[in-house]
Amino acid sequence: MPNLCTALEGIQKSCDNNSGGIYQVWYVPQDSIDVVTTNTTYPDYEVTAITLSPAAPTTQFTSFFVRRNTSNYTEETAADLINGSTFVTQTINLVFHRREMAKSNALKILGSGQQYLSAVVLDANGKYWYFPYMQLTATGEGSGVARADGSKYTVTTVAENEQLAMEVNLLNPAAYTLLGLV
């Protein structure tokens, strides 16, 4: 007896160039998010609007710039066939060069209180991706060994969500600036 909860959807062959890595990530406390509007009609599956609460202490996303070829995100789906549960572990790995007190403080605030964060990632293909309910789970690195190593921070934020990250395609182009996503 077939048990198809949702009709299958195909993946078309793409002729577009494909690049790895990320250019930038923005975070905002999850509590600052008022509404996330999505289009879940095939083939779009995208975030079309993000509204931040006017009462929130943070009214824009905060930018974290990363250097090329240093940072990435991964998404791994785990399905328990016995319990019938499925979730996606989303991990954003960031590297920040040159250790200094301002960066140390920014990372301390990012992880304070083990708060939930919403993240938007700009990948090397020029696409924005939305990751809700992230938490800072690790920071590391240090001075390096050789002079050429340079000092750096590594930062990991992780979430467990029900679906893969959704592409952000805001219907109002000015909204990117209003949200600080530039």
Model region roles, listed by residue range:
Residues I22-D31, I92-H97, Q114-L122:
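Short, hydrophobic/proline-enriched secondary-structure or compact coil segments at domain edges
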Residues P2-T6, I11-T89, Q135-R147:
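Solvent-exposed edge beta-strands and adjacent loop segments
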Residues Q30-S32, H97-M101, A124-N125, L136, ...:
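Generic structural motif
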Residues P2-E9, F87-I109:
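Charged, amphipathic alpha-helical segments
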Residues L107-Y130:
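Short, acidic/charged, Gly/Pro-enriched secondary-structure junctions
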Residues D80-M101, D149-L164:
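Oligomerization/assembly interface segments of phage tail-like spikes and tubes
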Residues M134-V182:
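Mixed-charge, glycine-accented linear interaction segment located at domain edges/termini
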Residues T89-F96, D123-G142:
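Short acidic, glycine/tyrosine-flanked loop/strand segments centered on an H-E-D-like triad
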